[in-house]
UniProtKB/Swiss-Prot annotation:
InterPro entries: Amidohydrolase, Bact_exopeptidase_dim_dom, Peptidase_M20, Peptidase_M20_dimer. This is Hippurate hydrolase. Its EC number is 3.5.1.32. PANTHER family: METALLOPEPTIDASE, PUTATIVE (AFU_ORTHOLOGUE AFUA_6G09600)-RELATED (PTHR11014:SF63), PEPTIDASE M20 FAMILY MEMBER (PTHR11014). The lineage of its organism: Bacteria, Pseudomonadati, Campylobacterota, Epsilonproteobacteria, Campylobacterales.
Amino acid sequence: MNLIPEILDLQGEFEKIRHQIHENPELGFDELCTAKLVAQKLKEFGYEVYEEIGKTGVVGVLKKGNSDKKIGLRADMDALPLQECTNLPYKSKKENVMHACGHDGHTTSLLLAAKYLASQNFNGALNLYFQPAEEGLGGAKAMIEDGLFEKFDSDYVFGWHNMPFGSDKKFYLKKGAMMASSDSYSIEVIGRGGHGSAPEKAKDPIYAASLLIVALQSIVSRNVDPQNSAVVSIGAFNAGHAFNIIPDIATIKMSVRALDNETRKLTEEKIYKICKGIAQANDIEIKINKNVVAPVTMNNDEAVDFASEVAKELFGEKNCEFNHRPLMASEDFGFFCEMKKCAYAFLENENDIYLHNSSYVFNDKLLARAASYYAKLALKYLK
């Protein structure tokens, strides 16, 4: 690998910062101390700092020269509601809150790049987006709705995530869909309760909900093109409390994912049609509440071509995978992708334990790798 020497020299200093953030994890939209630390460091490095963008987001801006070129680099800051089970000397000090997805590392790597870039000559505007609430709460959307790109516009936006694939590759990137969309549905099946001995006098929501659960699985198997990808997963089914009472209501919660907008739209249409049909057939009411968690993380071809050249220079072509299969997991960087030319990459974490696990450990070696990637992207574009 051909990492930036000055960044490697700063590795130890920023490991301590990462460990400090790890010890003090904060959930989405509650990243007050993390945001304060980020803002403080950026000010020390000489950046213009803007706080409370999208509630707890932070933006650092550094302009040099007279070019109109603008590049955005993004990192997420939030932790997960999970009890840490590692034996790390810097393990979480908070009960049931843990950096189990490596966002402490993402944030620190961008701070490391920020310090290095402040000492470099470039021509244009460097925008650093420190995003809150990636874990299902729509922090990216909140920043955008708070005027992120009106105030701090970028021609391209780049981001990355650590991934414990267990591969010998170090860097992963592809054109098109990198990660799936994610939509959550909460469905209420409303019938009429009654005595278990007289089902004919009730309108059984459990029976109707059971039909619904089975019918929903036909969307992927019978409606989605087999060459496309979609997932419909029922995560919760609740109804009743007694063995001899037919309840009034049954509830279903599910996650729906797709790798393209056409398939995503198709699944949504089928969900509503199936619910309507089962409601009519069983003389009950079905209410649907949909929440958009994240759009497809759709990488832009131009941005990928540019980022790929940087990755080859840093990691060596043999250590890069440019046709990696997209993941059915989601990432709200997809909201950025809907607005700007973006490229979202994965860096190998070299750890067997997967994300969102109480024993997960972020690999500190990624700090210099990711910071070098961020820095090279900025310097190459703003040359």
